[in-house]
């Protein structure tokens, strides 16, 4: 008996994370929520104040209740921070954290503050930390977003950030698997390539991700980076490959299976933004990339801006699930994704009632301020003392 079409749509929609413009639930947002999208990502365009963010998230969660909605934000610190002064604590760049006298302590403090402030405004996940190793001075994407230039330094700081952030009830996300630190292309504009052998990747790029997994990280984000060294190498000491015919990591079964099987990560794997220029010329477009990612065991696909792209990904996933009559391919993968997403939600995602309580607490705080919850002078002092300087954006 064929499954009901709505079942396929529900399985597909829960794998789509969408973004939208505006400070409240608008028509675009409402449509994606009503379709059953499992996650939403906020940007600076969605932020006016802590009370407004908390209320926005509470309204989105109420709209989909009793289903849970994962709300995420890029709150790395430095140049990638959607929550900023004057309302939120200024978080320094990962480079500044890594340069502190006690980088592990500094990362722990920063992770604690990020987790505290995200939870206060009903955000369930921060897309941090970056666990790339900054080994290429010409890399315009990573640079000061990395904790350091060695795997040990990056892994130690990342582990401290993850544990502290998640102890506040906010999921962390290690990125950008399997390493974006030694690339020169900006994947926002073009497809990048990591030309190293598997042996080199195991020595430099992969160890910080191992540390992140050992720290219990809830999610790993996969980059739109070609990694020919992971595509069935003849030996671990293969000469460096330069072929550009390999798929992006976000669509590669070989790259994602290495994370799952060799690194031992059993949590949620998500793609980088499907609207990035890196996928602009991909065969089959965003839809085919999403289907390829599904078969590679990617659980969640980010489509951060255009409703058209979000629907393209959702519809392609739905069609793939509907075509899988015996349930051995796309349907099985989507069902596995649902279970991993549910496990993350059980651990970190607030439901509608808890979100409403958070929103009311901030809205009713004395004098209309929120310093008890976010932007506390004490937290600014803790960050400043740990990092040894006034944080710079």
Regions found by a protein language model. Name each.
Residues 1-36, 252, 262, 280-393:
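Preference for extracellular/luminal or secreted protein segments
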Residues 31-43, 113-125:
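Catalytic domains of carbohydrate-active enzymes, especially glycoside hydrolases
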Residues 131-141:
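Short, conserved phosphate-binding/catalytic loop or strand-edge motifs used
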Residues 81-91, 137-139:
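Short, conserved acidic/polar surface loops in the N-terminal third of protein domains
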Residues 87-103, 146-148:
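A charged helix-plus-loop insertion that forms the helical arch/lid used to bind
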Residues 6-8, 19, 31, 45-65, ...:
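Second-shell residues forming the walls of enzyme active-site clefts
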Residues 99-123, 205, 288-295:
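Alpha-helical scaffold segments that flank or form the walls of functional sites
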